[in-house]
């Protein structure tokens, strides 16, 4: 044996005996194995493999390990450290396996087990399958590159059975999984880059992985971070995670918590930014962002939970959803201060947030933009929203199939082309307090039994105008507007149909006409159709609308203790097919008509199936403490329609009070107006086929006036003769009065009552203190056509007694009595009756009146069948069908006969008109006069002074105005 060989063997023997050997020579050894508590330090050496066990320790620097093929080939691991207190520590650019870029002959790089410890600083690991395996081992690695040239690599780092591993600035490439921690293992990652073909970071079965200081995680075809199993947890602060299937994924009790992390899909159709399933939880905090996923975050089944505070979600791809919750009843599902949007200005995500199959979600100050639908709650899910902003092109907020959504604290909801809030289906509910809602179609929409309740919410336009502020369609569909609600720039403020219902408290509606496809549509404040109900239970203001309230086979109630207002440019109240409107404490104005009962003929023209007149007879309007003013239009328009209108303590003041001029056939029912302690103003236009009844009672006053604005179909002002005629079928006057307004352009008015048809019942019925006030220009014996007076022509029977008042003036040469004329043509014909009447049907109060302040007495004489005054003169008959058996009530002077002791006027030789009984009294003691009539007691002194002036001026033939009083 040579001396050199002897020295080598001696050195080896010393290592085995004493446990320490400093190798400085360059010889290549196949294997380095240290055990039994021994320690070996090596540097710049190459080994096929090294092994430390049973407390053995290897400290290596700048080593090349496993760079050549193993001998024997069955050896598959380069570095093995096993057993408690065993240690291998490598540094200074040590290479395990093949050099980078070359294929390795070893399958496994490092195996650490049984509480052994492995440390590595710098260098690289390049093997076919797994670079680091820990089985109840401990590891600490820094600045190491791990890769594989194998086409099918395994886990880069696999740690299990309560292993502990710290990785600092580690780079992993070309791995199936970068880190796989199993069975209560703990892995701490600081910085570094981890790339994998499948899942990059895995925590299983109670293991914990913590990533800090901006680690970079990339999965080419799988999940970025994956935690599966109870107590399996991944924590990450800073850095980026890129995934293909899911960027973050947990299930069966796993937990992931990331903060200030950028989560990015890799552009290969990544489905989920963060996906939690089955009792698992993902928390995203700080400025965490999710980009390029088709579903930003998702929690699915068995109390799976997503919590996200701060940050943003950008999604893309077909059917993209910002946040999805499916079959998860976890009350911890929360998004707070999160912005959700499409990642492309030209792309709209399908849904911003979706909750399905009984899921529970809480949103706090969340913003959703660039979505088809902002929020969908389906199949008995629950979403609670505080603040935030939700914009969508389609329906913004949807609750359907028994789901509920609650919005609080001023949320802002916008739909640019559809409904803003939609509740669809039985038990589907939306509650909202405060905030604004803007919809292009409907701001609020309930259908198929859906329910919406909003309080102190403003329903606004979408920049142009909205179709409807709130719409309820279908049986049991309900919208309740609580607190103070404003609706602006909408075509319809409120709309219900097919059995829906809307109620409101304090409500303001400001309408706006809408242009659709070049057609300008009129706006409506409130519209109820098809057996629906609207109840306006608080102060209501409706303005800038064409139609105020519209009811078709439905009911609208605006009965509350507040002061309400309706300002309509066309019609204040429109009734259609058994519609009902109840109004109280309201001030209403309209440009064309105050109340319009729909034109039945127009419905027939339009081919509507509901044009049977019997279906229209129950339309009704009830006004209490309401003022309805139509200065230039019609108070009540009922063209070929039927129904009722009832007033109590109310007013209708119009240019024309009532109009029905399109009645082509005799209606089934009579239209009825009932006024109780109310005021009416305007004339009446009634078609000859129309049947209209006015019931005036309890001190109601109807003032007839000549229309100033009534026009024909061509827009031309009607002749004043047409405008001064009023027609009505039946009039019941109970403790009420009719007043003819002073003449216009020297034209007086005529009120026609009744049709004169055979078997007609009483068409004029007076009871209690019924009164009629006429205007007249005195003449005596003038032809009937030349007499200037208001008239009442009753073409039918009369019942009861009416007090008559007359006022007017006297013209020059018309003050003298015409005793040459027959008695039944003298004076003025005020009232004519074609049917049954009595001499007492119409009487001047106290039986007489005076003229021009003079003491001359005038009476109202009745000429007709069975009259003590004789028959009326047929030449005086003003009815279309001439018949001598009519009644003519005429204002005539009471003349003194030859037996009275009075002498004729010496100049005219005309018998003297009989003086009223009080003549001597009021000439001698004017202050003692008891006077009744149109002038009250406070004015008697002035009146008597005028009387004395008239008497003194008679001899001088002065022409003074006269007022006929009783």
Residues covered by each model-derived region:
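Beta-strand-rich solenoid/repeat architectures in extracellular/passenger domains
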Residues: 35-47, 57-77, 87-106, 117-129, ...
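Secretion/assembly modules of Gram-negative surface proteins
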Residues: 2-12, 20-25, 29, 41-43, ...
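Extracellular beta-strand/loop-rich repeat segments of large surface/secreted proteins
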Residues: 660, 664-834
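Beta-strand repeat architectures
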Residues: 33-38, 51-58, 81-88, 161-162, ...
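Glycine-rich beta-solenoid repeat tracts in large extracellular/virion proteins
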Residues: 27-33, 48-54, 73-84, 102-114, ...
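A common structural microfeature
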Residues: 55-57, 76, 85, 959-965
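Surface-exposed intrinsically disordered loops and tails
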Residues: 601-612, 709-720, 865-877
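Strand-connecting loop/turn motifs
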Residues: 115, 699, 957-961
């Amino acid at each position: 044996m040579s001396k050199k060989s002897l020295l080598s063997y001696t050195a080896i023997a010393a290592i085995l005996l004493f446990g320490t050997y400093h190798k400085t020579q360059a010889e290549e050894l196949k294997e380095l194995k240290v055990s039994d508590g021994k320690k070996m330090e090596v540097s710049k050496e190459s080994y096929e493999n090294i092994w430390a066990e049973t407390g053995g320790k290897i400290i290596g620097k700048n080593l090349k390990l496993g760079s050549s093929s193993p001998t024997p080939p069955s050896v598959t691991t380069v570095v093995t450290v096993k057993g408690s207190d065993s240690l291998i520590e490598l540094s200074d650019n040590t290479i395990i396996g093949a050099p980078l870029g070359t294929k390795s002959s070893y399958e496994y790089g490092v195996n650490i087990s049984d509480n052994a410890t492995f440390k590595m600083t710098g260098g690289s690991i390049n093997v076919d399958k797994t670079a680091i395996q820990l089985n109840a081992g401990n590891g600490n690695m820094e600045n190491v590159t791990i890769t594989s040239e194998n086409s099918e690599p395994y886990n880069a780092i696999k740690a299990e059975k309560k292993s502990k591993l710290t990785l600092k600035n580690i780079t992993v490439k070309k791995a199936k999984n970068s880190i796989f921690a199993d069975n209560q293992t703990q892995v701490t990652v600081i910085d570094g880059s981890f790339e994998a073909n499948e899942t990059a970071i895995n925590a299983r079965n109670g293991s914990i992985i913590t990533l800090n200081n901006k680690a970079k995680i990339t999965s080419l075809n799988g999940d970025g971070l994956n935690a599966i199993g109870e107590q399996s947890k991944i924590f990450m602060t800073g850095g980026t995670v890129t995934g293909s299937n899911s960027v973050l994924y947990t299930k069966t009790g796993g937990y992931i918590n990331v903060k200030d992390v950028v989560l990015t899909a890799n552009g290969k159709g990544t489905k989920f930014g963060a996906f939690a399933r089955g009792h698992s939880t993902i928390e995203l905090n700080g400025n965490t962002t999710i980009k390029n996923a088709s579903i930003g975050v998702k929690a699915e089944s068995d109390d799976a939970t997503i919590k996200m505070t701060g940050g943003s979600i950008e999604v893309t791809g077909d059917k993209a959803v910002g946040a999805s919750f499916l079959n998860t009843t976890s009350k911890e599902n929360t998004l707070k201060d999160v912005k959700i949007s499409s990642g492309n200005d030209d792309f709209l995500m399908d849904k911003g947030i979706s909750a399905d199959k009984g899921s529970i979600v809480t949103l706090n100050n969340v913003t959703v933009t660039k979505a088809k639908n902002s929020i969908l709650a389906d199949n008995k899910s629950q979403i609670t929203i505080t603040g935030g902003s939700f914009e969508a092109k389609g329906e913004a907020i949807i609750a359907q199939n028994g789901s509920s959504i609650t919005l609080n604290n001023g949320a802002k909801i916008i739909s640019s082309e559809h409904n803003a809030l939609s509740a669809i289906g039985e038990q589907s509910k939306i509650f909202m307090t405060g905030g604004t809602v803007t919809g292009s179609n409907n701001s609020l929409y309930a259908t198929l039994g859906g329910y919406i309740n909003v309080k102190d919410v403003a329903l606004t336009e979408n920049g142009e105008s909205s179709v409807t502020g709130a719409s309820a369609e279908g049986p049991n569909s309900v919208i309740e507007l609580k607190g103070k609600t404003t609706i602006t720039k909408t075509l319809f403020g409120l709309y219900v149909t097919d059995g829906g219902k809307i109620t409101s408290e304090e409500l303001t509606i400001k309408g706006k006409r809408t242009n659709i496809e070049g057609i300008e549509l009129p706006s409506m404040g409130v519209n109820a159709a098809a057996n629906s109900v609207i109840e306006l239970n608080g102060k209501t203001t409706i303005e800038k609308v064409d139609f105020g309230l519209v009811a078709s086979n439905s009911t609208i109630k605006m009965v509350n203790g507040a002061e309400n207002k309706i300002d309509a440019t066309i019609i204040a109240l429109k009734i259609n097919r058994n519609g009902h409107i109840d109004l109280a404490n309201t001030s209403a104005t309209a440009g064309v008509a105050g109340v319009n009962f729909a034109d039945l003929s127009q419905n027939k023209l339009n081919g509507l199936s509901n044009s049977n007149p019997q279906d229209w007879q129950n339309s009704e309007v009830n006004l209490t403490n309401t003022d309805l003013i139509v200065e230039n239009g019609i108070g009540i328009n009922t063209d070929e329609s039927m129904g009722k209108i009832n007033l109590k303590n109310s007013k209708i003041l119009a240019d024309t009070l009532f109009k029905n001029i399109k009645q082509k056939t005799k209606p089934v029912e009579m239209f009825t107006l009932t006024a109780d302690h109310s005021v009416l103003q305007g004339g009446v236009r009634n078609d000859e086929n129309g049947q209209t009844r006015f019931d005036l009672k309890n001190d109601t006053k109807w003032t007839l006036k000549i229309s100033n604005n009534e026009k024909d179909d061509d827009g031309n002002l009607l002749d004043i003769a047409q405008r001064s005629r009023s027609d009505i079928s039946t009039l019941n006057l109970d403790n009420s009065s009719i007043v003819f307004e002073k003449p216009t352009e020297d034209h007086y008015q005529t009120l026609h009552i009744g049709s004169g048809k055979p078997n007609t019942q009483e068409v004029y019925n007076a009871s209690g203190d019924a009164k009629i006030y006429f205007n007249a220009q005195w003449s005596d014996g003038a032809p009937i056509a030349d007499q200037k007076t208001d008239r009442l022509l009753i073409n039918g029977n009369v019942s009861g007694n009416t007090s008559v008042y007359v006022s007017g003036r006297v013209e020059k040469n018309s003050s003298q009595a015409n005793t040459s004329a027959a008695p039944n043509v003298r004076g003025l014909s005020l009232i004519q009756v074609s049917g049954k009447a009595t001499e007492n049907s119409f009487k001047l109060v106290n039986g007489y009146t005076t003229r021009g302040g003079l003491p001359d007495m005038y009476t109202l004489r009745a000429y007709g069948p069975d009259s003590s005054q004789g028959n009326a003169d047929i030449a005086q008959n003003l009815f279309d069908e001439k018949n001598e058996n009519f009644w003519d009530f005429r204002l005539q002077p009471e003349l003194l006969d030859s037996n009275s002791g009075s002498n004729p006027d010496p100049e005219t030789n005309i018998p003297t008109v009989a003086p009223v009984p009080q003549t001597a009294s009021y000439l001698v003691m004017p202050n003692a006069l008891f006077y009744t009539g149109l002038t009250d007691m406070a004015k008697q002194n002035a009146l008597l002074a005028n009387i004395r002036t008239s008497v003194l001026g008679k001899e001088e033939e002065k022409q003074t105005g006269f007022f006929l009083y009783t």
